[in-house]
Amino acid sequence: MQLNTLSMVHEFLKQHVAPGAFCIDATAGKGRDTALLCRLAGEGGRVLAFDIQPEAIAQTRALLSAERLTADVILDSHANMEQYAAPETVDCVVFNFGRLPGGDPAVFTRAETSVEAIGAGARLLKPGGVMAIALYYG
């Protein structure tokens, strides 16, 4: 089986996210990572998903609704995630840096907020928690 970036991240998450987990999708995009985190964390878990684009928020909510999954989908920068979770309470943080496929090519993740968000995510992680970071270019 040939793995692309998304499938490699998903395989990593399947190995590290258990039922009941508290997870953050820092870059919701089309919602694929959010949906997987919801399935892995299960009914006893919690998932927060962030994006700065209303289009991405709508796509994520639509996917979750179609799959009957629940997450807190938040229109805000991932750099602000510490406003939504306490330090050392999160099991998993996921970033997919790039831009929304099919979206405005002028809107993409930027170093200024992304570096800040990675630091915020690290502070939110429990000891033993995991962070997945995928980078897309173009």
Regions found by a protein language model. Give the residues of each.
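S-adenosyl-L-methionine
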Residues: 1-22, 26, 32-35, 39, 58-91
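Mobile active-site "lid"/loop adjacent to the S-adenosyl-L-methionine
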Residues: 94-116
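Conserved SAM-binding motif I beta-strand of class I
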Residues: 46-51
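Glycine-centered, small-residue-biased loops immediately flanking beta-strands
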Residues: 21, 45, 129
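A short glycine-rich, Lys/Arg-flanked "PGG" loop and its adjoining helix->strand segment in the class I
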Residues: 113-127
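Helix-to-beta-strand junctions that scaffold the AdoMet/dcAdoMet cofactor pocket
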Residues: 18, 41-42, 125-127
